[in-house]
Amino acid sequence: FVPNFTFDLERSKEIIDASSLPIDVHLMVANADDAGPLYARTKAESVTIHFEACYDVPRTLSAIRAEGKRVGLAIKPGTPIDVVQPYLSQLDMVLVMTVEPGFGGQKFMHEMMSKVETARKWLERENLSDVWLQLDGGISLETIDIGARAGADTFVAGSAVYKSEDPAEMVTRLRNCAESALR
């Protein structure tokens, strides 16, 4: 699904088990139908799969939920947001990728904000305010407010945090920026 490789299931379990923090697993794998339920059996709090990597979305979402996990559905930039709508009532999170998945440090794709706006309207119309609308990719102090104003409420900030001189301070600044935009 993506050209690079990070952790296999066993290594992921070690990391998840060692953490006292809630863990969100975002699977960028070729066969989410198999991997989703396997990762749902770990101590992770939530498991997000990609629509594009799943042959039977309803079955896979149900299998993850059956393990007591929060369930997320992600889409790549080239995938229409409409594919998510039939599953909204089964989800705890909709993830809109704002870069092509696979590598950090890419530029934020502003054109994805129309998808975020559409998803936010659906969630409000269907009274699903507890479903998180997440962005992943190119999140920084310059882009987080754009995403928040479009309707996103949850953000994955990789390079902005890990390449900063003070990662903890950067997390605080990103949170403050997003919260200001959400007011």
Predicted regions and their residues:
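Catalytic cores of alpha/beta
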Residues: 33-41, 79-91, 138-155
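Glycine-rich phosphate-binding active-site loops on the catalytic face of alpha/beta enzymes
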Residues: 47-56, 95-107, 150-170
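Conserved, mostly hydrophobic/aromatic
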Residues: 39, 94, 119, 136, ...
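N-terminal active-site wall of soluble small-molecule enzyme domains
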Residues: 1-63
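Glycine/Thr-rich beta-alpha phosphate-binding loop at enzyme active sites
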Residues: 1-6, 10-11, 77, 85, ...
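Active-site beta-loop-alpha junctions enriched in small/polar residues
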Residues: 28-32, 52, 76-78, 99-100, ...
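Hydrophobic faces of well-ordered beta-strands that scaffold small-molecule active sites
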Residues: 23-27, 47-49, 71-75, 94-96, ...
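Alpha-helix-loop-beta-strand connector modules within alpha/beta enzyme cores
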Residues: 5-25, 63-72, 112-133, 174-183
